């Protein structure tokens, strides 16, 4: 198959869909790989690295879309990219459609075969293609949040890790999944006071076993969330409902309870955010202030560390891409129900129920869709 890797064009998105090593693997399997000129430059990959791996360098994204059977990206296509997706063409990337009505309609109109990294599952119900980027975003949430607490960033002027004889700040993490766990790794390492809120008692027990008395586990049914966020210097939103819009856990009214100069990092923003006042921002202009609270809501946080992120992403996506290219999507998805869960849009039909429900589209099961 011909596999195309266009340059990412989302603002300040500098990752790329394939590393040169991944290209080498695909070429070794007998496939042709087209990479856009300088597509990997910001992630530290030169054109020469790709040509040495067997790729062809293409000057224009349009030519890659026109000539490829599979398009491999990192972030969801922007609307001018959606227009280039052809009927029956496979798109393999993050999509986050539950928070993107116009994109969803565009992909329906394209009649392409759209497989989302973030809804592919594993045998345990985990999200193996989302996990590495969630880990990166979770760790970055504390780094970025700590920076935003500085006075010249609009924060309260607090050093999150404290100083000799001076207590550090308080971090409240909503959600104990991959984002929350990785946020806690950095926050506890900085010696902040860390609360983790989750609805699962079992998950909190796992986190307590990992972190010991470095965290304060809080079962969501048993806490006064208003009181807890009023104590937070840094609030991290890391709640996820797979493939669906994130629940709004913190309302605008609750925001008024937070300290002046405190910080919110809403990692869930690519699924709509779990804070009512959140709105997507970019690495170029990452923050805004509402009611004296700094909001950091960059929708592609791992794009700020493209080299680490691209390697981490390829480590998990490549085996699935090899299956797609070697077997074709119908066989690859048909023999693996966990991979099939990644199919969100198929030839004009929405095949992921949470997306169909949120926008009122007719739902066609992925299993039925690939038979046609």
Region annotations inferred by a language model:
Residues 66, 70-149:
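Phosphate/diphosphate ligand-binding glycine-rich loop within oxidoreductases
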Residues 31, 86-89, 109-112, 259-262, ...:
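A short helix->loop->beta-strand "cap" motif at the edges of active sites that frequently abuts
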Residues 69, 75-76, 95-96, 221, ...:
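Short glycine-/small-residue-rich Rossmann-like dinucleotide-binding loops
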Residues 12-13, 21, 25-32, 45, ...:
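Metallocofactor- and cofactor-centric catalytic cores in central/energy metabolism, strongly enriched
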Residues 209-291:
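Rossmann-like adenosine-cofactor binding region
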Residues 118-159, 168, 269, 274-372:
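Adenosine-phosphate binding glycine-rich loop
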Residues 54-67, 218-229:
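Short acidic low-complexity segments
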Residues 6-7, 11-44, 152-240, 287:
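Glycine-rich phosphate/diphosphate-binding loop of Rossmann-like nucleotide-binding domains
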